[in-house]
Amino acid sequence: DGYSGVLGRALINQEWRQDFDGFCRILRLPLPNVSAAAITYDDADGVEQTVDSGSFRILSDHMSAYVAASLDTVWPSARMDAGSVRVTFTAGFGDEPADVPASLRSGILLMVGDLYENRATVSERGSGRIDMSTTVNALIAPYRRMTV
C-alpha cells in the first residue's frame, strides 16, 4: 500500500528511506508501525557518518512515526544540505501475512473477490477509481491514515 495508497501504510515489513535537509527536533517518517531505524548523515566535511542506535528513539503520535534524539542527547552537527540526513527504517505490521490484522486481511480478500466477480465491469471502466463496498470500508477504516 505505501504512503500514497488507500491505507497510507506498509502491511508487511518493508525497508524505506526518508531523506532530510539536516537534523531538526524530530525527524517525521511518512509511515506508521516503524520497528527499526538507522540514521546516517554527512558531516561538515561531507563525510558519511552513522548515528549510534542508542542516541535516538523511535516514537509515534496521531500523525505518524518519528525519530527523536534520546533524552540528554543532542543530534550531531550535519551539513545543511538536501538529503544530508538519511533515515532508513522498517515499517509494517510484521514479516508474515499473519501479522497483518485479521479485519484488514478480510477486507482485502473481500475487495479482491468482488473485483474478480465483477471483472468485466471493472475492465470496461478502464483505469479509473473503483469504489469499495461498505463492508470493505468498515473493515479497513481503523487502519486508514488520513493526511492533509
What are these regions (language model features)?
Residues D1-V148:
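Divalent metal-cofactor coordination and adjacent catalytic microenvironments
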